Amino acid sequence: GYDQEWFTDEWQRLSGCGPTSASQVLGYSLFRDGLLDLETTSDQTLALERMNLVWKYVKPRFGGGVYKTQWMERGLTRLLEDKGLSYDVHMLNVSPFCASRVEVEAAAQFIHDALAQDVPVAFLNRHKGKEKALYTWHWVPIHKMFMDGDDIRCGIFDEGEIRDFSLANWMKDTILGGGFCYISRKE
């Protein structure tokens, strides 16, 4: 996976989790669809060039980064349109208010729909709850979802590590919500 520590600018390294996750979703999708070759996809220098391009569209705001899923959705949509890439952006917001929060099953279905198309999901976690594998106020790509007994778990890439967290526990415990975003090829 890509790493926001690759950015050369201090502000980008500090607040670049959103553009980094968006770059991974985009880069993987382009590779899968034959629009990026393996050498280009796996080269860190070229990946950083894509991260800097994505930064111009999925731009962190001072005081909080890309802390709204709508900003990820709008930025990716603009980038795809500007570059003539035939993809749709899908977004699911998780409200900070329990009464208006989507059900765990709906979030799991959204993630499943993306992964079934062989595309990672950018995940915004504004508050980690009790999930030790997550950092608060952070975007990470989800690359898999699996069951562990009755628990729905999501595999993530972050800081060069592979970790997993409980989707149900996160949705129950988060006090600030978050959301999910992926792209799919237009038909």
Report each predicted region and the residues it spans.
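Active-site-adjacent structural segments surrounding the nucleophilic cysteine of cysteine proteases
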Residues: 1-74
